[in-house]
Amino acid sequence: MSIVRIATFILSVFIVGMVEMMVAGIMNLMSHDLNVSEAVIGQLVTMYALTFAICGPILVKLTNRFAVRPVLLWTLFTFIIGNGIIAIAPNFTILVIGRILSSAAASLIIVKVLALTAMLTKPKNRGKMIGVVYTGFSGANVFGVPIGTMIGDWVGWRFTFLFIMAVSVLVGILMIIYLPKESELAHAN
């Protein structure tokens, strides 16, 4: 796999991980703006994880019969829309809808990206390469949450989600360029 493809996969896993945990760093800003308690805002992390866990297997089962490239691109688009809903949410209820949409899409993104990583890597290097791609998730906790918190503190919590959308658009462009075509997958290991 090319370095740029690997970087694209790492970045896609990074944004998924960042969205999950960054609420912790901007909880007080969200709470104040939406007029709900920090405890209620904190439940957004639980909602994300629960939706991720439930929707992941279901969405994988529903999408396995389709080509991975369009599924991944449409799923990323859904992820962007979900975060857009969060960014403009006038109240907590609308924010929850965006959060559920975002986390459902995230569950499929991470599974498809890790599956592609395995498919495009020689058997002897698969575990290592999956680990490399998954560093995006670890990096999201180490770097993504503080970045999201800084953005929230500087310009408001909504801009944190706009930042996620911008990075997601970049990932989408990279995916359009670097995701394998079906012919490449047919010849993959």
Show where each model-derived region lies.
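Extracytoplasmic
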Residues: 5-38, 56-59
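Small-residue-rich segments within alpha-helical transmembrane domains of MFS-like 12-TM solute carriers
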Residues: 17, 21, 103-111, 142
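Residue-level signature of mid-helix packing/kink "hotspots" within the transmembrane helices
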Residues: 21, 49-57, 141-142
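Conserved MFS/SLC helix-loop-helix module at the cytosolic interface between two early adjacent transmembrane helices
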Residues: 54-93
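MFS-fold secondary transporters
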Residues: 82-87, 102, 118, 175
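Helix-loop-helix hairpin linking two adjacent transmembrane segments in secondary transporters
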Residues: 94, 132-177
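Cytoplasmic helix-loop-helix junction between adjacent transmembrane helices
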Residues: 98-136
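Flexible cytoplasmic inter-helical loops of multi-pass small-molecule transporters
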Residues: 177-189
